Amino acid sequence: MSLLFPEGRAGRLCAPAQILAVCVISVIGAACSGREGAVTLAGSTAFQPFAEKLAEEYNDAHPEVNVTVQGGGSALGISAALNGAAQIGMADLVELPADAASLKATIVARDGIAVVVNPVNKVSSLSMVQLKGIYVGNIRDWKDIGGLAGPITVVSRESGSGTRSSFETILGKFDLTRDAIIQDSNGTVRETVANDERSIGYLSYGLVNQKIKAITVDGVECTTELILSGKYPLVRPIYFLTLDKLSPAARGFIDYVLGPAGQASIVADGLLPAK
């Protein structure tokens, strides 16, 4: 479900929605708990499609195991791992919160955060200062940053999103403009920007396609090479978060993701390796 309304209104709905999602994951986890080979993941919607592919690959190679993946956002991934609703929480955060300190954090991939506009937009480069100005609401018209005159449609993620948390942390913490359109996944951000010539958004580098245009940030393109080199400024790790005690099936899946086949799959889909 896309949340097409300002941040203030979306914020009031976030907590109940997150509680519902945790309950759903808890039910799934309980249903699977009796199966020795069941592995449940929940959290980051940025990593969710990649995790689903990894799960499919692992399930095919290990029919005795059933790996299931749910989204919900990084905040939910942390809470699900803490309360046992999921064996593996997924989070894409530059900084893990204090409540995750009791969890084992394993980096399984790295990802750039691409800043994207509609392909017809003539703007192809922004500085970090300009980008923050747009998301704070100080810069409201494309003509002020080299584009054609017209209001900027600011597209952001919901408050529990790891992509949003990382984006705001790297730019320097700020209060998001209340005019922003809030979306609940990378995919809906992509579709919104693809369908609005005046929009700007941010999403996982691995999900950029021909429907949108990734722009340079501080003069650096968002490419695999420049992300790996450390020159591109908007980069975050992808974590698997677990309790100390893991089932053999969960440990086997994590080992697969960190191994040559899993890392090759991650890279083939546009993300960066863990190391």
Task: Provide a role label for each language-model segment.
Residues 1-14:
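N-terminal secretory signal peptides that target proteins for export/translocation
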Residues 32-275:
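Exported/periplasmic ABC-transporter solute-binding proteins
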Residues 2, 17-20, 34, 68:
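Hydrophobic alpha-helical context, especially transmembrane and signal-peptide helices
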Residues 7-10, 28, 33-36:
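Feature targets compositionally biased, intrinsically disordered low-complexity regions
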Residues 16-29:
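Bacterial N-terminal signal peptides
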